Each structure stands twice: as C-alpha cells, then as structure tokens.
Swiss-Prot record:
Organism, as annotated: Aedes aegypti
Species classification: Eukaryota, Metazoa, Ecdysozoa, Arthropoda, Hexapoda
Family classification: Belongs to the Mediator complex subunit 18 family.
Function: Component of the Mediator complex, a coactivator involved in the regulated transcription of nearly all RNA polymerase II-dependent genes. Mediator functions as a bridge to convey information from gene-specific regulatory proteins to the basal RNA polymerase II transcription machinery. Mediator is recruited to promoters by direct interactions with regulatory proteins and serves as a scaffold for the assembly of a functional preinitiation complex with RNA polymerase II and the general transcription factors.
Protein name from the UniProt record: Mediator of RNA polymerase II transcription subunit 18
Any one of the GO CC terms: mediator complex
Self-association and partners: Component of the Mediator complex.
Keyword Transcription tagged: yes
A single BP term in Gene Ontology: regulation of transcription by RNA polymerase II
Length: 215
C-alpha cells in the first residue's frame, strides 16, 4: 500500500533534486531589438535556422504583471515576482521568480540569472496581494517563438493593457535557455547561434544596473 509523502519528505526530495542539478533553475539570456521594417527578414532567417521549419513559428500573446514586496522606508524591494497568463490558450497561470544577474566571469557570452517558473491557479494574484505584494506594472506581449534544441527565441512586441498600439516601432528579440546550475557550455552554443543572426540583430548581455542608474 502506498502513502503520500510527508511535507518534510517532499522538501528532502526537492533538495536532492537541486543537489543533483536536474532542476532548470538558471536562465541564460541574450537580448536585442529590431525595427519593424526588418522584422520579416529576421523571421525568415529564424525559420531556416530553427527546428520548427515545417510548422512555422508558434504565435503567442501573454499578459504579464510584475509585483514587488517592499519594506516601509526602503526603496529596494525585498522580492519581485511576475505572473504570466497566455491569453489565447487554457494554459495555467505562471508565477515566475527572476534573480539578479550573476557577476561571474565578464567574458561569459550571456547573462546568467536564477529563474524559477511555477504553474499556479488564477487566485495567485489575490494570494500575493494578501502577502503584501503590490503591482508595479503590467503589459501584453505578442509575437512569435522558435525552438533550436534547448534554445528558445522570441520575437515580440510590448503593448499597454487595453491598447492595440505597441509602445515602440521595434521588436524585442530574446534568446534564452533554462538549465540546471553549472551548464555554462550552453552560453557558448547561444553565442554561436547569435552570430548567425547578424547583421539583422545584435544579441548581447544587457546591463540592467546601468539602466537603473540613468537619471
């Protein structure tokens, strides 16, 4: 006769999985942008390079909300999380935690940061609000997704909620991989793939701290 695992047993199993490096908890990321006038050329290039050649890219439309937990009289949030929901499918809500980029080796070709994605119920926003989280901003992302092995490429536009007009005349291009800790060889694979997209788009590590220091 089988019995359900106790909470402590579940925690132990999770810790064992983390120690065994089988949980994809690190995101390797490169980002860039491309003007509307050149986007079709990039999509054509990606169709030829990526795995879903026959079926074409996967279109998506996601609603995303950023919430933060702050301490009174402190400017820096204690924690920031994101809640995402695909608008055109019955997929569950996604709760996502994104950590600060690792300093690490400056010669590393990609940005690396902790990332955890959890499927959850539609009540997740109410739950976070009860915990003290507050909404910082929200937006809609619409675009196309390609796959190349473990790599994911998205070409998307950002819209304000309840607006049909994009916030800019360019597309955001992201190349990312979710992987367990310590698989830095992925970064080299991403660099090689990004080179194949030049000169249409320049994918690079983005220094978010530099943006935060801008007046």
């Amino acid at each position: 006769m089988t019995t359900s695992a106790t909470p402590m047993a579940a925690v132990d199993l999770l810790q064992q999985a983390l120690n065994s490096n089988i949980i994809p908890n690190q995101e390797y990321l490169l980002q860039g942008s491309i003007l509307d006038s050149a986007a079709e050329h990039l999509l054509h290039r990606l169709r030829g390079l990526c795995d879903n050649v026959d079926t074409g890219p996967e279109a998506f439309a996601d609603y995303e909300m950023c919430l933060s937990l702050k301490v009174p009289n402190e400017k820096t949030p204690v924690m920031t999380v994101r809640v995402r929901k695909a608008q055109d499918t019955d997929a569950p809500y996604q709760l996502r935690y994104i950590g600060q980029p690792e300093l690490g080796d400056r010669n590393r070709p990609t940005l690396v940061r902790s990332s955890l994605d959890i499927a959850c119920t539609p009540h997740v926003v109410d739950f976070l609000t009860e915990m003290g989280f507050r909404v910082d901003f929200e937006y809609i992302t619409k675009g196309y997704m390609f796959r190349k092995g473990r790599m994911k490429v998205t070409v998307s536009k950002i819209f304000k909620v309840n607006s049909s007009e994009p916030i800019s005349q360019s597309y955001l291009v992201e190349l990312s991989v979710l992987a367990p800790t310590g698989q830095d060889v992925i970064a080299d694979d991403m660099r090689i793939f990004a080179e194949q997209l030049k000169p249409l788009v320049q994918l690079e590590k983005i220094d978010y701290k530099r943006f935060a220091q801008m007046p």
